[in-house]
Each structure stands twice: as structure tokens, then as C-alpha cells.
């Protein structure tokens, strides 16, 4: 991308947009952070060439996956790009690749390990690249929730549906209890399937995707949904509330999409007459209701590809992707702006930078396996069961 082609979005920086880097541990997940002493300097002018050389040396032994929310400096080295589930499936379709370098976050690398063969090794360039939403539901908390459902006498009626953006432990719990996984693209089908299996759904960890899908796609009311807070006894709900609910939503959210507000939508409509507002279903219900279009990252990309020249769009999703789309479609006369006025990067996605990628590729090229993500066999078996149920959805 040349400087002349680059489109700058009108956003203001905020100190809350990016977490401080270089901690010894992720404060939420307590995952260790590997900061090797030989990590290249970000100012090294040869970083791009070093990454290219190491990748060339590895050849078909390495397959680099790049999530849509990654930095441009990283995404340029991805063999494929996409959302988390697409990337995991792409990895499984490349059995000749000994190393899968996942430029994404921890739960994505876990999913890739679950779906790839035992001979393949999944690597995450920075072990602290977690997901705050995935970390909002731990195995212990979900087990306590199931106990509350059992005490309310409804556990046998409940089918768990877990978002792809969850840990391997939560996917395994879901598989063990007869549930399925969903993505933002197939959440409607997953919920329809779940309600064919039982009378109620426990949806975790993203309350907004669960609520939006139930209300927009299945015709439920907000009153059909209750919010389970894992930090309160019995989730802060009475047994009667649990028995009356159709959707039991986990109190989790995406820190990026949760920033978009109704005020953001109103403001952009005032600033840009005729703008189309397109948001991700992880946004709050009132934001989704005020938008013109709602869909996954893949949906957003396809919608902009099909949009007519001269159309105007305000996008409510992660800023790296929005910037990339704005630059891509600017030559076609499509005006694309970020929905919010402040920077809204995914802070953990941004931990994967070019120095970490270079260090990873050079280490692998030298025969040193670093930052491997490996799911234990029992967890893998139940998590894979839940994923296979999703793959079998019509």
C-alpha cells in the first residue's frame, strides 16, 4: 500500500485503547508472557526482510494464519486471512505444514490445535495474546453455573451453546453437556438446533451475540433472556428467574465491540448524511437495533465488496480491519469510516507485532520450537465433539 493510497480514519487516541505491554503475566488469565532476550527491536530496518527470509527457509513446513484484526505489518506475511474458525479449518487442510503460526489470540490457537493432526505444532508468537471475553468464563465458573441450574431443577432442559471465542476448557464443557459451538455467522442455526434438543439455552461467553441472535433472528423478547453473573451467588438470579428464562446469557462481552454506543450511531448519521451503519453482532443490542446492517467480519467484508461506488459506510468493528477496508475500497469511491471517534484496537491482538513474528519464524527456522499451544487429550476430545456438532449444522 503506497502512502498515496492510504486513507486515514478520523479517530482520536485514548489511553484505554491499548493495554500496557511487557507484563510478566496477563492479569486476567495469568498466562505466562514469553519475552525472549533476543526479541528484535521494532526499529530494526531489516525486520521485513528477516521475516521473509525465515519464512522462505521454512518453506512448506510453516503455514502462517492471520486474523482480520491483525496489524498490517503482520498480515502481509499471512498465507491466509480470515476469522478464527476459518483459519483453524484452513490449518487442518494443510497437513504438510509442520508448524502452524497463528497470528491471532490464545483461544484461536487452541482451536487450531484441536482441529489439526498430532504431527502439527501450533505456535502463538506472543503467549500473552489472550482474549478478555474468552477469559470472562472459566471452567470453574461454568461448573458453578451448571450446579445452579441443577439446583433450580432445569439442567436437563438446558443446552449449552458456546461462542467460538471461548477457551478449550469451555468448548470441552459444551461438548460434554450435549451442546455445540457457534460463530457469529452461524449463531442462528446453532440456536435453532439447540432449541430442538432442549427447552433452554445457556449461551456463553458473549451476552451480546446471544441476545442479538435470540431477539433479531429467533423472534424472542428481551424478557425471554436473563443475565448470569458469575461473580454473584447463583449468578444473581433466583431459581424462578432461571426456570422462566429461555436464554440464559453469560455476563461476558468483547471489550472492543462493547465500546460502540447508540450515541456513536447518532453522531455518525449527523456527520455523514446517507451513511450506512454496519456493525458486528458482538455490539450491544441497542447499537445493533439502530444499525442498518449487522454481520460477522466475513459478512462485513462481503457487504463492502458488493457496495456501489460512492456509497458511505460507518463500520462498528476492530480498527485494524476497518482501516484496511477503507484503504482497499477508497479507489472505488467507497467512503468507509470508523463508527466511533476514539481508537478501538483489540489490545491483545495487537500484541502480535512484527518483532514477535520475526522471532518466531527465525526460531523455527533454526529448529527451536517456541510458544507451542497444546490442548490436553481429554479436553481436546470433548471440545472437538462440540465443534463437530457445529460442522454438522444444516
Predicted region positions:
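Active-site loop-to-helix "anion-binding N-cap" substructures in soluble metabolic enzymes
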Residues: 2-316, 320-394
Amino acid at each position: 500500500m503506497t502512502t498515496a493510497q492510504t486513507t486515514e480514519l478520523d479517530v482520536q487516541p485514548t489511553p484505554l485503547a491499548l493495554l500496557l505491554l511487557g507484563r510478566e503475566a496477563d492479569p486476567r488469565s495469568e498466562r505466562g508472557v514469553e519475552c525472549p532476550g533476543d526479541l528484535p527491536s521494532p526499529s530494526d530496518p531489516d525486520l521485513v526482510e528477516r521475516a521473509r527470509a525465515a519464512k522462505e527457509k521454512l518453506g512448506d513446513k510453516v503455514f502462517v494464519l492471520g486474523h482480520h484484526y491483525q496489524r498490517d505489518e503482520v498480515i502481509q506475511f499471512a498465507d491466509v486471512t480470515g476469522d478464527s474458525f476459518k483459519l483453524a479449518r484452513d490449518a487442518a487442510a494443510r497437513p504438510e505444514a509442520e508448524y502452524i503460526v497463528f497470528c491471532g489470540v490464545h483461544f484461536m490457537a487452541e482451536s487450531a490445535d484441536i482441529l489439526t493432526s498430532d504431527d502439527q505444532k501450533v505456535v502463538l508468537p506472543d503467549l500473552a495474546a489472550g482474549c478478555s471475553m474468552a477469559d470472562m468464563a472459566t471452567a470453574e465458573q461454568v461448573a458453578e453455573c451448571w450446579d445452579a441450574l441443577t439446583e433450580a431443577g432445569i439442567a436437563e432442559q438446558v443446552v449449552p451453546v458456546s461462542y467460538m471465542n471461548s477457551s478449550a476448557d469451555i468448548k470441552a464443557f459444551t461438548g460434554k453437556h450435549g451442546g455445540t459451538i457457534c460463530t457469529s455467522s452461524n449463531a442462528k442455526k446453532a440456536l435453532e438446533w439447540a432449541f430442538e434438543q432442549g427447552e433452554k439455552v445457556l449461551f456463553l461467553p458473549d451476552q451480546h451475540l446471544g441476545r442479538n441472535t435470540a431477539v433479531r433472528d429467533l423472534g424472542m423478547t428481551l424478557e425471554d433472556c436473563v443475565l448470569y453473573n458469575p461473580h454473584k451467588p447463583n449468578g444473581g438470579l433466583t431459581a424462578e428467574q432461571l426456570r422462566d428464562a429461555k436464554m440464559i446469557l453469560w455476563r461476558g462481552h468483547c471489550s472492543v465491540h462493547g465500546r460502540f454506543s447508540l450515541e456513536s450511531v447518532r453522531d455518525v448519521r449527523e456527520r455523514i448524511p446517507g451513511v450506512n451503519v454496519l456493525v458486528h453482532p458482538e455490539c450491544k443490542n441497542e447499537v445493533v437495533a439502530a444499525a442498518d446492517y449487522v454481520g460477522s467480519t466475513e459478512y462485513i467484508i462481503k457487504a463492502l465488496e458488493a457496495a456501489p461506488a460512492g456509497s458511505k459506510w460507518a463500520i462498528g468493528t476492530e480498527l485494524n480491519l476497518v482501516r484496511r477496508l477503507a484503504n482497499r475500497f477508497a479507489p472505488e469511491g467507497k467512503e468507509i469510516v470508523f463508527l466511533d471517534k476514539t481508537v478501538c484496537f483489540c489490545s491483545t491482538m495487537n500484541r502480535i507485532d512484527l518483532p514477535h513474528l520475526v522471532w518466531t519464524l527465525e526460531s523455527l527456522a533454526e529448529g527451536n520450537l517456541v510458544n507451542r499451544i497444546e490442548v490436553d487429550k481429554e479436553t481436546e476430545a470433548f471440545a472437538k465433539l462440540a465443534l463437530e456438532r457445529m460442522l454438522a449444522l444444516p
